[in-house]
Amino acid sequence: MATLEQKLQELVADPIDAMGFELVGVECQRAGRFLTVRLYIDKEGGVTVDDCSDVSRQVSAIFDVEDPIADKYNLEVSSPGLDRPLFTLAHYQRFVGREIVVHLRIPMLDRRKWQGELVSVEGDLITLKVDGNLQAFAFGNIQKANLIPVFNF
């Protein structure tokens, strides 16, 4: 059974692509009775506030017609930002060599949070170098992962 995030992604990915943007990912977060639906978009050269506004209007129109969400919700459209979330294996592959933080569904070695250099992606295994040691994680056990921003002054 598809999650709400997967259903929404299927619904809006093609229209967003037709507008010239990549749908990086969808997050749904509940706070009480309200749901926040967060869409991350990107394109070559980055996205502007106007781009986010245009995509928000298009997606709102789609949601009005298709009515995929039963609850009250807030729609947020933004760029992935410097701490870009990683949603797919292709995202991990793209950022091999970068520092990331990973939050696991099921702890490994009594830890849920791991930070290190993304060394490789093989099949559904993500390998990080953590404190000089290699540690592999099953993609399915990763609840959330983000790039660690690099600031060069």
From Swiss-Prot:
Q: Name one GO cellular component term.
A: cytosol
Identify the domain of life: Bacteria
Coarsely, its chief localization is cytoplasm
Arranged from A to Z, the UniProt key words for this protein are: Cytoplasm, Ribosome biogenesis
**Where is this gene product found?**
Cytoplasm
One GO biological process this protein is involved in is:
ribosomal small subunit assembly
The UniProt entry, under Pfam families, shows: DUF150_C (PF17384), RimP_N (PF02576)
What function does the entry list?
Answer: Required for maturation of 30S ribosomal subunits.
Q: Which family does it belong to?
A: Belongs to the RimP family.
Q: Which PANTHER family match?
A: RIBOSOME MATURATION FACTOR RIMP
Q: Which NCBIfam families match?
A: PRK00092.1-1
- Protein name per the record: Ribosome maturation factor RimP
Q: Give the organism the record lists.
A: Glaesserella parasuis serovar 5 (strain SH0165)
Q: What is the lineage of its organism?
A: Bacteria, Pseudomonadati, Pseudomonadota, Gammaproteobacteria, Pasteurellales
**Gene symbol of the encoding locus:** rimP
